[in-house]
């Protein structure tokens, strides 16, 4: 059956995601970044993902188009510096005949290639032909504890609310 996976090039580039602490950040009394510091540090790495999907002929013999928006996070560049990779949700980019565009906070847009996605984990990867963009700093989620404060930054309801910050706590 269908595994829920799609890979454009399974032998393509590999990106290592490592914890990269920033020694210049302000922390709270527990040594954790404050909400303001999280926003300042992560917001430049947040992108909008705009997709359109052209469905094949409907009952009337016409092509139909659907569109949607989501959030992505800049992972980093490939070794050549030619491409930048973006993590997003699989449900945003999955489908046939999907055209994706990545939009930066300043409005700059790039056509994006769907590298692959896994519907079961809802993780997708895009790539754009760009360099010099600020990649997000990734931590180790296995070090989180129940009750610890966490934050999410994204574009709820599309790019109109670009870089919205919300907070919560780790549950079980």
Which role fits each region the language model picked out?
Residues 3-172:
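Serine-dependent protease modules
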